[in-house]
């Protein structure tokens, strides 16, 4: 089905009902969703040895960073070198920097060896969007007296592995030399041994300060090696050394050391390596061109990041310089930032009180399906595929892709043939994309089933074709032909029959009245006219198709019956008082006379030609009466 915005609902008999249902869908969807995306950050925060005000300014700038074309507060922060005493300070700084965002610290563990060797790993996440599964946490010894932490986060409302992020936050052994590289490799092996036990196809993030010096270092290659936990590098596996690759570097934003490490910006120590499912464009997935070394403009190789002007924010030198100064004073690493697409949030609605419904009719019971995930840019919403099926009482439905609200996708259902009287039914909508929040709905409804109308030219049986003949003298003016239409077998469990359109008329034939009539137990009357003026003697006929519909309810069906009208002119003396030309003087003609009552010179109802239709003409009419 094709998705449609709210203002494109077609005009139909159920527009009001559809608008109400759509409004419910939108309100329910927005009420159940928080405006969020997953901006993921890792940053070696250097034991808080930097300027706390500068650290706060960096956090502020992270939330305002619109270099990818949009800005959003970080949803996941993976921090290194966090001491036991620094943890609370970091929480306070973050709360001041990005107020109103409910941040939660995930399981935090620190051993005495970690506290004395640079600090531990800390994970902070948005609790309105994500939740930690504490049982998924694990400490993995990875050398240099430090542990790598494994955390398990799930997007709220999801119940499958596609909604889970496995995050390994690490700080591998520092310094060059083969012995240090070997310690890093052993640590990477320990992490991979753990990751390879996770469910196949898991969303895995390896993030932190790797301290690797090149793309040929064994620890780096270990993360990329074959196996269930294999990772890919968002920046590719080519060399990152030298000025040509300055845009990739993360350490150090300072030349001078002091309480922080100096040396200039010439190393790529900080990484987010991702498992293949995080590149597939489904569920959690890296958004193209969003992986970046925060504040690095690529023009500060082996110098301080605030040397001269910085151009990280294109065309905004002052803003870029302000960030560069904050990065310089905050830490001896700069953050790595990446933005992820997020799985959908399914929402759908079906009118729960359908009222009267034509069984076996058209598919006009509509379920509306949408993705209620509120993202700051549509590109951040992963496709939300779904399937919608009826329970057998309702039939129809199908598969589709749910668009972001306020647009919606539609699936149509009909009431199965043969259902009359009160009924209950349901539609099951289930997400088929991975990681979707609120992935299943069982939409219940009820109504009153009715049979389709049965149009007929006869009241005793179904007759859908007939011929009606009339005779008239020449130049008798307009004659009328009355044809009854029946709704055979009507009862309170059968639809009324609405007479809508008469097509095919022409050549002097026209419909005078009867269209718009709703036929139930009593027949409706179609009155056709034929203008005999100027017609030669002979037979005139026309084939007419009557389009009728069931009453204006879900399942409304269109019906067609056909009629041949034949008028023969000549060879018949006019019958005085027969105003409708049917050869009889009866109540129909009396009605025409009364309708012309009053001054009416030249009217056929003025039988005594005195210019007035009055009691004298009524007396003559009764004298001509044939019954």
What do these predicted ranges mean?
Residues 26-27:
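Repetitive helical segments and hydrophobic/amphipathic motifs
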């Amino acid at each position: 089905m094709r998705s449609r915005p709210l203002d494109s609902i077609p005009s139909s008999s159920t527009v009001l009902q559809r608008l109400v249902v759509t409004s419910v869908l939108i309100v329910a969807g927005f009420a159940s969703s928080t405006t969020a995306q997953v901006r993921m950050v890792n940053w070696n925060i250097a034991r808080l040895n930097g300027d706390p005000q500068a650290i706060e300014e960096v956090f502020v700038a992270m939330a305002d960073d619109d270099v990818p074309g949009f800005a959003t507060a970080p949803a996941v922060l993976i921090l290194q070198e966090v001491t036991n005493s620094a943890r609370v300070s970091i929480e306070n700084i973050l709360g001041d920097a990005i107020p109103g965002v409910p941040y939660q610290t995930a399981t935090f563990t620190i051993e005495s060896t970690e506290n004395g060797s640079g600090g531990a790993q800390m994970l902070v996440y948005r609790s309105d969007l994500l939740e930690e599964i504490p049982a998924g946490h694990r400490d993995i010894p990875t050398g240099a007296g430090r542990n790598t932490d494994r955390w398990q986060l799930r997007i709220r409302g999801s119940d499958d592995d596609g909604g889970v992020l496995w995050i390994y936050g690490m700080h591998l052994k520092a310094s060059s030399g083969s012995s240090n590289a070997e310690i890093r490799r052993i640590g990477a092996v320990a992490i991979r041994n753990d990751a390879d036990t996770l469910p196949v196809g898991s969303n895995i993030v390896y993030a932190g300060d790797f301290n690797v010096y090149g793309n040929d270092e064994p620890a780096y290659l270990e993360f990329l090696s074959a196996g269930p936990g294999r990772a890919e590098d968002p920046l590719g596996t080519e060399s990152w050394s030298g000025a040509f690759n300055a845009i990739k570097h993360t350490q150090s934003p300072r030349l001078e050391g002091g309480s922080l490490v100096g040396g200039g910006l010439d190393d790529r120590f900080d990484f987010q390596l991702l498992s293949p499912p995080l590149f597939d464009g489904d569920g959690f997935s890296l958004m193209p061109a969003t992986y970046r070394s925060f504040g690095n403009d690529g023009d500060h190789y082996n110098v301080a990041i605030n040397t001269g002007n910085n151009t990280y924010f294109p065309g905004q030198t002052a803003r870029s310089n302000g960030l560069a100064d904050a990065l310089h004073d905050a830490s001896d690493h700069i953050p790595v930032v990446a933005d992820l697409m997020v799985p959908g949030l399914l929402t759908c609605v079906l009118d729960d009180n359908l009222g009267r419904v034509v069984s076996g009719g058209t598919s006009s019971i509509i379920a509306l399906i949408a993705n209620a995930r509120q993202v700051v840019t549509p590109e951040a919403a992963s496709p939300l595929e779904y399937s919608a099926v009826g329970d057998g009482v309702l039939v129809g439905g199908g598969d589709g892709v749910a668009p972001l609200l306020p647009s919606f996708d539609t699936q149509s259902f009909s009431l199965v043939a043969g259902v009359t009287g009160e009924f209950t039914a349901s539609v099951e909508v289930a997400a088929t994309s991975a990681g979707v929040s609120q992935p299943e709905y069982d939409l219940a409804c009820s109504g009153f089933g009715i049979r389709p109308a049965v149009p007929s030219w006869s009241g005793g049986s179904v007759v859908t074709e007939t011929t009606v003949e009339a005779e008239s003298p020449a130049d008798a003016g307009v004659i009328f032909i009355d044809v009854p239409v029946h709704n055979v077998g009507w009862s309170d469990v059968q639809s009324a029959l609405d007479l809508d359109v008469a097509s095919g008329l022409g050549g002097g034939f026209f419909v005078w009245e009867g269209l718009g009539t709703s036929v139930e137990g009593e027949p409706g009357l179609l009155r056709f006219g034929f203008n005999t003026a100027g017609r030669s003697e002979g037979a005139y006929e026309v084939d007419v198709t009557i389009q009728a519909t069931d009453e204006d309810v879900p399942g409304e069906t269109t019906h067609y019956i056909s009629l041949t009208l034949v008028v023969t002119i000549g060879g018949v003396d006019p019958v005085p008082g027969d105003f409708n030309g049917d050869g009889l003087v009866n109540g129909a003609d009396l009605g025409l006379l009364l309708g012309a009552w009053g001054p009416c010179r030249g009217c056929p109802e003025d039988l005594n030609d005195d210019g007035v239709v009055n009691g004298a003409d009524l007396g003559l009419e009764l004298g001509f009466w044939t019954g």
